[in-house]
Amino acid sequence: MDRPAAAAAAGCEGGGGPNPGPAGGRRPPRAAGGATAGSRQPSVETLDSPTGSHVEWCKQLIAATISSQISGSVTSENVSRDYKALRDGNKLAQMEEAPLFPGESIKAIVKDVMYICPFMGAVSGTLTVTDFKLYFKNVERDPHFILDVPLGVISRVEKIGAQSHGDNSCGIEIVCKDMRNLRLAYKQEEQSKLGIFENLNKHAFPLSNGQALFAFSYKEKFPINGWKVYDPVSEYKRQGLPNESWKISKINSNYEFCDTYPAIIVVPTSVKDDDLSKVAAFRAKGRVPVLSWIHPESQATITRCSQPLVGPNDKRCKEDEKYLQTIMDANAQSHKLIIFDARQNSVADTNKTKGGGYESESAYPNAELVFLEIHNIHVMRESLRKLKEIVYPSIDEARWLSNVDGTHWLEYIRMLLAGAVRIADKIESGKTSVVVHCSDGWDRTAQLTSLAMLMLDSYYRTIKGFETLVEKEWISFGHRFALRVGHGNDNHADADRSPIFLQFVDCVWQMTRQFPSAFEFNELFLITILDHLYSCLFGTFLCNCEQQRFKEDVYTKTISLWSYINSQLDEFSNPFFVNYENHVLYPVASLSHLELWVNYYVRWNPRMRPQMPIHQNLKELLAVRAELQKRVEGLQREVATRAVSSSSERGSSPSHSATSVHTSV
């Protein structure tokens, strides 16, 4: 199938970078905008940052507007009629219109808009706003310059105006969630006629404007149904469950037991529903300890939950204490239970004064409590903000390392990996069951359990296994994607936003760097997942929990991201992958072994892109490997045929065993 071109990685900054997913209609590969396109405009690399002064930028907007000699635009009344005529006449190139997805519609077209690129200078072209994307194109350059941005990645839109030389000009600054910002300039009269700013706000933030996300309008057809990738019963069966110690429970089948948990959970066999309800009353949000993963040999388990509601008076719950004892007893290899609290000890103490808390060793005598000292969502959000400041639009080469260090981003990645390694080591080497929680059990808990499971279980390092891991530990167990990402919401300052899932994927990428042959998927796979975390093209990351997804008909009215990915696995496959089953990975969680993911965080800067087309080279290697495998299979068949023929000719003569060809590619 033809691969849809990517909006999430297109344009001046990204046109020559990775192409991680669909964000426009099916179309031939497009030329990238970059330093080689057309005549170079005056550089604007010294533009203020999005948080800096707007005065200098307004001056540049005026100059850009005057120099562009803006001549006109397409009125909103003519958009649909003109588009139909051009489509029927196959004249899309004439009007520089955007290719559309099935279900996507054009909302506004404005000609002679100026895109102020921080790397190439000002570029004049046609701006198209649809209900899914912002599409800017200049056909005068060779190759054509294209900026293709899903509206879902937009965090906020700011309008700026100025007057000079009697010529009104407008500017729009678009702050994105994927480490870039965009600046556009056009005549004031065009804004008045077409409402560019209003159109962008309306369709970039549909939920704030009483509309549905575009994923509910997207009508692409794929040969594979990605919603069938994860089946909880099948996944637990793969792990050997149920068994004598653990049962698959449907106590939450109607989401009344815990509204943020999945319908199907695994709990100790001996625990009665009444006792389970009492445990739920003692755990924040009713998120009781439930099984995530079980070791196939030792039966040591990873269970996840939320904090106990101990409070300042050290409240106890005998059912909860007995419940954790039952979890420990289910593993005959150890007489101890390790409780990993992801939080900082001081923060957990503060939570205790507010009614939360942690398990005391006096109430849980066979448990050992370990604080992993990982910071909260607000600290992580601020760290990413600092990182964006140093990677876009310009990079201070002289202070690069110290600037990266100052964001603490890699330090927080290190802490997550170190915590997950400790969990995996207790399970694998210590044969000890562990309980993992933070405050509510849907942020740091998901990071730690999924990373530990990735280290312990080679299945999760395959493409479909990783999809299962994300569906299970993140989506079904209630990571609040809608709140953490802010899908379709214009409240960019919402304190609930945080790059929790991004950190997890970054940790996975760090592991692929340390174990390049241990993962079936490649870097493009991870970037594609992150791009569509924001794009709102697919339904995979919408809503906050499983119950909400059913209420919103996400599974029936939207398409899964895995439908797209699994329909073209070669694009996302690692040619160096070797499937070592039962092989545990222990990544080195040291800053000396970690690096900033430049191909993701700095991909919009054309000067930071790798000189070699890595993705194309990987595809070629996959083709070579497939050809070599065919040749090996052919040789094996030839050897087998000769052996049979030789045996027949000798008849009753003593048999000679043929030597098999054993070749690994």
From Swiss-Prot:
UniProt-annotated catalytic positions: C438
Record-listed phosphate binding positions: S439, G441, W442, D443, R444
A GO term, aspect molecular function: protein homodimerization activity
Start and end residues of each Myotubularin phosphatase domain: 226-601
Annotated binding of a 1,2-diacyl-sn-glycero-3-phospho-(1D-myo-inositol-3-phosphate), by residue: N351, N376, I377, S439, D440, G441, W442, D443, R444, R484
Biological process, per Gene Ontology: phosphatidylinositol biosynthetic process; phosphatidylinositol dephosphorylation; protein destabilization; regulation of phosphatidylinositol dephosphorylation
Residue positions where N-acetylmethionine is found in the record: M1
Membrane topology category: Peripheral membrane protein
Chain ranges of the GRAM domain: 90-161
Stretch list, region Required for dimerization: 608-665
The keyword Metal-binding is assigned to this record: no
UniProt keyword annotations, A-Z: Acetylation, Cell membrane, Cytoplasm, Hydrolase, Lipid metabolism, Membrane, Phosphoprotein
Amino acid composition bias (Gly residues), ranges on this chain: 12-24
Compositionally biased intervals (Polar residues): 39-51
InterPro entries given in the database record: GRAM, MTMR1_PH-GRAM, MTMR1_PTP, Myotubularin, Myotubularin-like_Pase_dom, PH-like_dom_sf, Prot-tyrosine_phosphatase-like, Tyr_Pase_AS
Sequence similarity: Belongs to the protein-tyrosine phosphatase family. Non-receptor class myotubularin subfamily.
Quaternary structure, from the entry: Homodimer.
PANTHER family noted in UniProt: MYOTUBULARIN-RELATED, MYOTUBULARIN-RELATED PROTEIN 1
Record comment regarding domains: The C-terminal region is required for dimerization.
Name under which the protein is recorded: Phosphatidylinositol-3-phosphate phosphatase MTMR1
The organism of origin for this protein: Homo sapiens (Human)
Lineage per the UniProt record: Eukaryota, Metazoa, Chordata, Craniata, Vertebrata
